[in-house]
Design a protein with these regions (language model features):
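C-terminal recognition in membrane/secretory proteostasis and scaffolding
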Residues: 2-7, 22-32, 39-44, 93, ...
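Bacterial N-terminal signal peptides
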Residues: 9-19
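Glycine-biased strand-turn-strand hairpin within the trypsin-fold
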Residues: 26-43, 47-103, 111-113, 124, ...
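Active-site loop architecture of trypsin-fold serine endopeptidases
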Residues: 28-29, 34, 41, 63-65, ...
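Short, conserved catalytic or interaction motifs in soluble domains
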Residues: 57, 99, 146, 173, ...
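Conserved catalytic-core segment of clan PA serine endopeptidases
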Residues: 97-98, 117-147, 156-160, 173, ...
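Short glycine/Trp-rich loop-beta-loop segment that forms part of the substrate-binding cleft
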Residues: 102, 124, 157-178, 258
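Cleft-lining beta-strand/loop regions that shape enzyme active-site pockets
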Residues: 152-158, 166-169, 211-214, 382
Length: 467
């Protein structure tokens, strides 16, 4: 190489190295002022925090004074034995999702409340009325009692767009200390084995969520609402870095029903009983791993039957979204709007096929429902005849016979004895129960002894009570 070319090449190398060293030194030096480096969530918080509110619920509960059972006490004070009432208060959070004053919160925050008040970030307080509550998703929608005021509100973001590792902020009122903001990342986007609501599909985050945060907002870095904070996993009662939020796409469904004036949430139903895929089933189907939702049975005259679904079909996706287990299917299907159709990807006899299923609302069974009012173990339970749609909704064998408990009044004898939504009553005092009127008639007999047989979670159990 000629001397002048070697000199030019060497000069270029020296200049390049100097530039690298200068850049490296510049990157590693300590910033000379706070203006050079500013990492803050303040702009997002300032925009979204005014839409996060505190929710105060008050309910009257019956209490019995143990001294009233003492005959000497009653004789001395001239008071009959009995019970009194006291006010029980609970505190949670909520999110304004409409400038007109609609607030979404957790159902467990306001369950059984006789009075609900909402406190805004600017310290204003309003009474709130119940618009809709949905125990299945643990969501409720309130409306502030105002005179045409306009409120700050959050917009929904697409919770399906979240990815593990995304940064999120949790905003609420933990331990009643006042509005608090914590940050973290998305730890999981489809946590299904949580056991909180009927729809087992949650966003998991390590953002600190504590008692009082229930019903608060989980927002992304654009300020969009991606979830409603609902629960924590904790052995101490405080945050341990495992919090769960209901995805915004499920919240949308509940809010849409509230805006349309409905008192219940309208969701599509399939009409098929699903089961998880075990390692043994996966091996028999030739799958590499357990995944999907296996159809165990199909109800007659259901959307599933009309679509041609069969027992043994394996649902692997809904509109292209992968299905890992029956809980994931329930969530994906429940967040579809009524009307139109959904395309299910199936494995049938070792081949992949696609089937279109109509998105139909669950048939109204309200005319079959009644509340047991007679003094009995069932007092306060709302019961219904078991229909294919209700069996699908509660994951009960559609071929079963009996009367199902669809709701239990807060503080009722039925709740005190542990009856739950989804319990299938088979017999009472050796009398078979097949219709709601059967159970109503038996409950009115006011027996001193009760022998009750129910099915819960697929397991038959019996209980004996004296009263």
């Amino acid at each position: 190489m000629p001397f002048h070319l070697r000199s030019l090449f060497l000069a270029i190398l020296i200049s390049f190295a100097t530039a690298l060293l200068g850049a490296s030194a510049q990157e590693r030096r300590v910033p000379s002022s706070s203006n050079e480096v500013r990492l803050s969530y303040a702009p997002i918080v300032q925009r979204v925090a005014p839409a996060v509110v505190n929710v105060y619920a008050a309910r009257m509960i019956a209490v019995r004074n143990p001294f009233f059972d003492d005959p000497i006490f009653r004789r001395f004070f001239g008071m009959p034995g009995g019970s009194g009432e006291q006010v029980q208060r609970s505190l949670g959070s909520g999110v304004l999702i409409d400038p007109a004053g609609l607030v979404v919160t957790n159902n467990h925050v306001i369950e059984g409340a006789d009075q609900v008040k909402v406190s805004l970030a600017d310290k204003r307080e309003f009474e709130a009325e119940m618009v809709l509550k949905d125990s299945r998703s643990d969501l409720a929608v309130l409306r502030l009692k105002t005179h045409r005021e306009s409120f700050p509100a959050l917009e929904f973001a697409d919770s399906d767009a979240l990815e593990v590792g995304d940064i999120v902020l949790a905003i609420g009122n933990p331990f009643a200390v006042g509005q608090t903001v914590t940050h973290g990342i998305v730890s999981a986007v489809a946590r299904t084995q949580v056991g909180i609501t009927d729809y087992q599909f949650f966003i998991q985050t390590d953002a600190a969520i504590n008692p009082g945060n229930s019903g608060g907002a989980l927002v992304d870095m654009t300020g969009g609402l991606v979830g409603i904070n609902t629960a924590i996993f904790s052995r101490s009662g405080g945050s341990q870095g495992i919090g769960f939020a209901i995805p915004a796409n499920m919240v949308r469904v509940v809010v849409a029903s509230a805006r349309s004036g409905g008192s219940v949430v309208k969701r599509p139903w399939l009409g098929a009983r699903l089961q998880a895929v075990s390692p043994e089933i996966a091996e028999s189907l030739g799958l590499k791993r357990p995944a999907g939702a296996l159809i165990a049975s199909v109800s007659t005259a259901s959307p599933a039957a009309r679509a041609g679904l069969k027992s043994g079909d394996l649902i692997i996706n809904v509109d292209g979204q992968t299905i890992e287990d029956p809980n994931a299917f329930d969530y994906r299907f429940a967040t579809k709007p009524i009307g139109g159709s959904a395309r299910l990807g199936l494995m049938r006899a070792g081949k992949e096929i696609a089937v279109s299923v109509a998105l139909e609302a669950v048939p109204d069974a309200s005319h079959d429902e009644l509340v047991i009012a007679s003094p009995s173990p069932f007092q306060g339970a709302k019961i219904s005849n078991l229909s294919p749609a209700l069996a699908d909704d509660l994951r009960i064998d559609p071929g079963a016979q009996g009367v199902v408990i669809v709701d239990v009044a807060n503080g009722s004898p039925a709740q005190g004895l542990g009856f739950q939504r989804g319990d299938l009553v088979l017999s009472v005092n050796n009398a078979k129960v097949t219709k709601t009127r059967d159970l109503e008639r038996i409950a009115a007999q006011q027996s001193r002894f009760w022998r009750i047989t129910i099915v819960r979670g697929g397991q038959q159990m019996s209980m004996e009570l004296r009263g």
